[in-house]
From Swiss-Prot:
Protein name: Eukaryotic translation initiation factor 3 subunit J
InterPro entries the UniProt entry points to: eIF3-like_dom_sf, eIF3j
Keyword field: Coiled coil, Cytoplasm, Initiation factor, Protein biosynthesis
HAMAP family the UniProt entry points to: eIF3j
Bias-annotated ranges (Acidic residues): 28-46
Assembly information from the UniProt record: Component of the eukaryotic translation initiation factor 3 (eIF-3) complex. The eIF-3 complex interacts with pix.
One Pfam match: eIF3_subunit
A GO biological process held by the record: formation of cytoplasmic translation initiation complex
Length: 236
């Protein structure tokens, strides 16, 4: 009976392998490698996403040598121009003066046209055929500039008077009155300007300081008969 129990116990005993021993010791290393690779990928993405710093442009200081060279060239150019003018004959100087005057007149005309909002004058006075208000304004600006070229002549005032009279002959009495009022207004403004200029010039003349000397006092006494030289002669 005892033998049966022992045999039964022996048959029931089952040796189970240790689960811990069956675990592959290399298991999990692949997972670690995958985690590391994912970290490396994320780091690379972060590096790519970081904005690249743009270097500020370096401000270069002006080259003093270049500046001095340009100034020297300008000075030499001016000296050559002065030398050229000095070597000119009277006829050449007159021609040069007229050339510069023409340039100045063209500049004045351009300024006058810009004042009236005119961009160009086309082919000159002969090319004008004004019909609208703007066209007459443009024509008037050009004509005024042309006439003003002779303002330095002694005959210019009389010429303007005759011209205005001749033009006003074609106007009605009401229109002539408008012209008269406009000229009178201009006359008042000119009169104020001339008076102010004359007053300013007079004030400058009064500002001159005269030096006072010791002889001024002696001369003053002599006016009243106090001549010290005579007293000295009487004493002697």
């Amino acid at each position: 009976m005892a033998d049966d129990w022992e045999s039964a116990a022996d048959s029931e005993i089952v040796i189970r392998p240790n689960a811990a021993n069956n675990i592959n010791k290399w298991e999990g290393e692949d997972d670690d490698e995958d985690v590391k690779e994912s970290w490396e990928d994320e780091e690379e993405k972060k590096d790519e996403e970081k904005p690249t710093k743009t270097e500020a442009p370096v401000k270069t200081k002006p080259n003093k040598a270049l500046k001095a060279k340009l100034e020297e060239q300008e000075r030499l150019k001016e000296e050559e121009e002065q030398k050229r003018l000095a070597e000119m004959t009277p006829e050449e100087k007159l021609a040069e003066k007229l050339r510069l005057q023409k340039i100045q007149e063209e500049s004045d005309l351009k300024s006058a046209l810009e004042t009236f909002g005119v961009t160009s004058i086309g082919g000159g006075l002969d090319a004008f055929n004004p019909e609208s208000k703007e066209e007459f304004k443009e024509f008037g600006a050009t004509l005024s500039w042309k006439v003003a070229q002779y303002r330095e002549s002694i005959h210019f005032p009389q010429f303007i008077e005759d011209l205005v009279r001749s033009l006003c002959c074609n106007l009605s009495a009401a229109d002539i009155k408008k012209v008269k009022m406009s000229v009178e207004s201009l006359h008042s403004e000119k009169l104020k300007m001339e008076k102010a200029a004359a007053k300013k010039s007079a004030m400058k003349g009064k500002g001159k300081v005269s030096l006072r000397t010791e002889n001024d006092d002696i001369d003053g006494y002599q006016k009243y008969g106090n001549d010290f030289t005579d007293d000295y002669d009487d004493f002697m």
